[in-house]
């Protein structure tokens, strides 16, 4: 999908819409070494009554040779193994060997993508011995092993007459594996452009071999595999075997380790903290009113299961203050909590200012509390490192975010690939600016602006190169261009991170999740915002 950065023009939402239109019942996501789009894909499939199959394309090493493998999760154990494998790939710069694969086979189906495999290279060099040895090793460790044949192979008479016959003699199972890197045949230009952008603006040689990597309709695929219908039947067989169930909406909160019952400890800290606060009040107050409010808030927090959440925030705020790291007085709805005020998390008395606790936390609205804490931007990392050390490297991570193609970036990159001169590029921007001078459109797509500008349409009609640049820029807008780190978000988990999300390298020796903040929150994980301010 689009989440194989600059390797695919296949956007998840339009892909699922197309699958639904074609009345297809299942689809497998197989990105290159990463699982960035897994949750979005899974949710979008379920929303449209299409069965999601979770997969991963793995590059592994064996005897100084590199081979590719497609792995699909049969069950949740397999899904866990995919997350481990993807994490290993990203954290070791794609350094996975055969021995590691042997340890992580449970719950997985393996498919050798013939056209991208070392087996094809061996056979084309008439080295059947090494080809079969490679296949036998894989067959030995994966109880469900297939050779996947794409359109290029199945329509190649030389392959069918020679190599296919040889492979069939060894009783391997075969499956149709038409690779999809872009949705419509007309999206080939967007795909080649993305690959060129990855290749420093230079079109990739031999990419014409990928022309068939679009989503073929059912009739076309049935025609292509007409003489090998068993391969199509195996796609259904595999889809039926794969039944990963990802749970959403259930909180997976970490525990604050104090050696005491969390709620009892929270209650004790709040009582001590509130007494200290009241001793410093310079205004009259009703003590009973404060304790009634405190007990009410504590009961709500306890009923909703958030005692540990408040203790975790209290702990790192206390660390910051103890180490002379300035902490903001509170922002958003958090200052409406007397518990937060009593713990020293915020500095605003919610009763004095008549702030409603329900704006912050409400039993009728099932959502995680959201306490954003401000730190000086030059000391924020100290607090994050403290949290990482306290809860362990395997339980604390930065959060992934994508840098996507915005209008200007898409046009600039396409102009570079197709060598559009500066004069024409400036002309495009002049008309783009003119069409939205009065901000009539809120965050418009490039396509919307072109449709609203007769001048841009005229340019496209008169100049083929401008037409090409703008047409492709429309197609790649909003596709991820690079990965980045969420400006403030940190996730803390109850158990090892890899039980919930695959991992990437992060900053300051702290891992980074492969899932975005929205995905992590859907999984019920605890996201906390450590905001860095200059002033």
Task: Name every feature range the model reports, one short phrase each.
Residues 1-535:
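Alpha-helical scaffold/interaction cores of sigma-54-like transcription cofactors
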């Amino acid at each position: 999908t689009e989440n194989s950065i600059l390797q695919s023009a296949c956007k998840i939402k339009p892909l699922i819409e197309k699958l639904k239109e074609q009345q297809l019942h299942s689809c497998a996501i197989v990105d290159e070494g990463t699982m960035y789009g897994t949750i979005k894909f899974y949710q979008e499939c379920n929303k449209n009554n299409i069965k999601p199959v979770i997969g991963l394309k793995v590059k592994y090493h064996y005897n100084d040779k590199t081979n590719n493998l497609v792995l699909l999760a049969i069950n949740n154990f397999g899904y866990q193994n995919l997350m481990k494998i993807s994490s290993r790939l990203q954290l070791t710069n794609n350094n996975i060997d055969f021995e590691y694969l042997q340890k992580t086979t449970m719950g997985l189906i393996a498919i050798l993508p013939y056209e991208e495999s070392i087996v094809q290279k061996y056979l084309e060099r008439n080295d059947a011995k090494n080809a079969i040895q490679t296949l036998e090793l894989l067959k030995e460790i994966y109880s469900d092993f297939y050779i996947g044949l794409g359109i290029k192979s199945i329509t190649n008479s030389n392959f069918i007459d020679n190599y296919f016959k040889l492979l069939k003699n060894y009783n391997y199972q075969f499956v149709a594996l038409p690779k999809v890197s872009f949705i419509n045949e007309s999206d080939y230009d967007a795909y080649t452009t993305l690959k060129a952008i990855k290749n420093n603006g230079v079109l990739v040689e031999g990419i014409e071999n990928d022309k068939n990597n679009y989503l073929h309709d059912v009739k076309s695929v049935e025609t292509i595999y007409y003489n090998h219908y068993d391969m199509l039947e195996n796609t259904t067989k595999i889809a039926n075997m794969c039944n990963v169930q990802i749970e959403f909406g259930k909180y997976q909160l970490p525990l604050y380790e104090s050696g005491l019952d969390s709620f009892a400890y929270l209650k004790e800290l709040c009582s001590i903290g509130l007494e200290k606060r009241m001793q410093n009040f310079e205004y009259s107050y009703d003590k009973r009113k404060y304790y009634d409010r405190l007990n009410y808030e504590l009961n709500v927090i306890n009923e909703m299961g958030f005692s540990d959440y408040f203790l975790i925030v209290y702990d790192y705020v206390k660390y910051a203050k103890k180490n002379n790291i300035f902490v903001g007085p509170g922002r958003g709805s958090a200052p409406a909590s007397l518990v937060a005020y009593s713990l020293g998390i915020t500095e605003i008395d919610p009763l004095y200012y008549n702030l409603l606790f329900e704006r912050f936390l409400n039993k009728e609205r099932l959502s995680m509390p959201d306490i954003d804490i401000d730190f000086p931007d030059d000391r924020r990392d100290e607090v994050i490192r403290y949290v990482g050390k306290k809860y362990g490297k395997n339980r604390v991570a930065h959060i992934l975010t994508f840098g996507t193609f915005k209008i200007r970036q898409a046009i600039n990159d396409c102009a570079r690939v197709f060598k559009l001169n500066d004069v024409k590029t400036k002309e495009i921007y002049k008309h783009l600016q003119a069409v939205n001078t009065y901000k009539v459109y809120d965050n418009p797509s490039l396509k919307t602006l072109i449709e609203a500008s007769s001048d841009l349409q005229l340019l496209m009609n008169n100049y083929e190169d401008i037409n090409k640049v703008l047409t492709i820029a429309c197609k790649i807008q909003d596709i991820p261009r690079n990965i980045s780190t969420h400006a403030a978000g940190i996730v803390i988990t109850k158990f090892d991170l890899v039980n919930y999300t695959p991992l990437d390298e992060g900053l300051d020796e702290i891992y980074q999740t492969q899932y975005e903040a929205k995905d992590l929150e859907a999984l019920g994980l605890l996201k906390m915002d450590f905001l860095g301010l200059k002033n």
